[in-house]
């Protein structure tokens, strides 16, 4: 496999993952904001449960990590823009684990009548989703820049 093909495949999966994250931040999050707190408390655990079982969601977020290993073994770090994009992708995923997962857990533990706490968690989730989407978008841009050289 040529380096260009390997990078193109990595870019495709990274772009698919970034698209999913951007959809969550720009479409699904505003829809969650329209829900009352009790409905949000029911919806978010269901969304999380379905997301972790989704072949698409898990695949597009996992394939780049798995593919990075042979990429770095074979091609090292000779394409700095591409490597920077992979680093941003890793950062976006790490940010998701650090920021989003605790929110999912807290919302699942809250009762539907804890309106103020649910409202605050939803606000935090919106911020976390936007951060993750922005970093994911930057990762795709950085990786794509490599193809201009």
Report residues per predicted region.
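Membrane-water interface of alpha-helical transmembrane segments
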Residues: 1-7, 51-55, 72-83, 123-129, ...
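Interfacial loop at the N-terminal end of multi-pass membrane proteins
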Residues: 2-10, 14-61, 108-123
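Interfacial segments of alpha-helical transmembrane regions
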Residues: 2-15, 64-67, 76-91
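Core segments of transmembrane alpha-helices
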Residues: 57-71, 132-141
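Mid-bilayer segments of alpha-helical transmembrane spans in multi-pass integral membrane proteins
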Residues: 90-98
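A cytosolic-side transmembrane-helix exit/cap motif
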Residues: 99-111
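Juxtamembrane boundary at the C-terminal end of a transmembrane helix
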Residues: 144-149
């Amino acid at each position: 496999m040529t380096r260009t093909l390997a990078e193109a495949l990595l870019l495709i999966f990274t772009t698919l993952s970034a698209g999913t994250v951007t959809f969550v931040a720009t479409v699904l999050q505003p829809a969650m904001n329209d829900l009352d707190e009790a409905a949000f408390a029911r919806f978010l655990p269901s969304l999380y449960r379905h997301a972790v079982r989704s072949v698409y969601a898990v695949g597009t977020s996992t394939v780049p990590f798995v593919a990075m290993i042979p990429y770095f073994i074979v091609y090292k770090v000779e394409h700095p823009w591409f490597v920077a994009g992979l680093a941003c992708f890793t950062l976006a995923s790490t940010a998701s684990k650090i920021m989003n997962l605790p929110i999912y857990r807290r919302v699942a533990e809250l009762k539907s009548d804890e309106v103020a706490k649910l409202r605050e968690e939803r606000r935090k989730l919106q911020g976390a989703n936007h951060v993750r989407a922005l970093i994911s978008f930057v990762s795709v841009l950085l990786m794509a820049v490599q193809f201009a050289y």
